[in-house]
């Protein structure tokens, strides 16, 4: 009830697999191995063989990788792709909900512009997935999302199926600068810590009330309302 992955569910559909042979590549295997002038056979979306002069049928699509590198897909674990798209203009710069130091109720995926041209640029550099987060203006900036680097019309069709939510928190200069400059808390690191403590204490209380209600009998539940839904507390209770 407090961190529902089914909300805004992924509609990702894998690309149709091809039979591919990549020839004469320089390869980093991601485990310390390096291979040169080497072939890679891919079938049903999986690497089935690596070696020199591999035999293959004429069903395979041939990619000449002479002078090029083949590596595992790079996963960008801290990205603002799509929430700060290019070109960087105010109308689409939606990575920080800098209206309160704690905005745990917002989700980065609701700001992502899927037409950000940086996706294609990143793909040319081998980046195949992103963990996209809100910015660091706030103590608690909201939920992050994991997406595949695909050309799609909606963010739901890019979302990595069953990937857990994450939570962006910023502990240093940015929150105290953003809010201190406005004459608000936090303006110091001790203000940062106090803001965190207050939020997590509130979340503990919210979670306790939820659990107490769920433990009641069906008869008792008919006599009282469930705790009032709070989107901010839902996220924090989900972390707890």
Regions found by a protein language model. Give the residues of each.
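Structured core elements
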Residues: 21, 41, 76, 131, ...
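Histidine-rich, glycine-flanked metal-binding segment
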Residues: 13, 18, 27, 31-71, ...
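N-terminal pre-domain segments of enzymes
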Residues: 1-17
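Soluble non-cytosolic domains of exported or imported proteins
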Residues: 16, 36, 57, 96-100, ...
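Polyanionic/metal-chelating signatures
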Residues: 118, 123-240
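Solvent-exposed loop/turn segments at secondary-structure junctions
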Residues: 27, 48, 69-70, 79-82, ...
């Amino acid at each position: 009830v407090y961190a529902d992955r089914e909300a805004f569910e992924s509609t990702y559909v894998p690309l149709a697999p091809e039979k591919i042979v990549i020839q004469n590549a320089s390869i980093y295997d991601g485990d310390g191995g390096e291979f040169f002038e080497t072939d890679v056979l891919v079938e049903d979306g999986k690497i089935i063989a690596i070696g020199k002069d591999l035999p293959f049928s004429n069903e395979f699509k041939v990619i000449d990788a002479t002078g090029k590198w083949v590596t595992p897909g790079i996963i960008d674990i801290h990205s603002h792709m799509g929430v700060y798209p290019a070109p960087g203009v105010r109308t689409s710069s939606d990575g920080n909900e800098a209206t309160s130091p704690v905005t745990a109720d917002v989700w980065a995926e609701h700001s992502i512009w899927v037409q950000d041209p940086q996706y294609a640029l990143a793909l040319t550099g081998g980046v195949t997935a992103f963990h996209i987060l809100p910015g660091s203006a706030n103590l608690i900036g909201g939920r992050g999302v994991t997406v595949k680097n695909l050309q799609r019309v909606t963010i739901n069709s890019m979302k990595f199926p069953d990937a857990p939510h994450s939570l962006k928190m910023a502990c240093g200069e940015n929150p105290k600068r953003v809010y201190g400059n406005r004459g608000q808390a936090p303006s110091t690191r001790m203000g940062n810590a106090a803001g965190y403590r207050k939020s997590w204490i509130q979340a503990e209380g919210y979670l306790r009330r939820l659990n107490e209600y769920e433990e009641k009998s069906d008869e008792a539940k008919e006599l009282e309302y469930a705790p009032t839904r709070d989107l901010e507390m839902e996220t924090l209770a989900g972390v707890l």
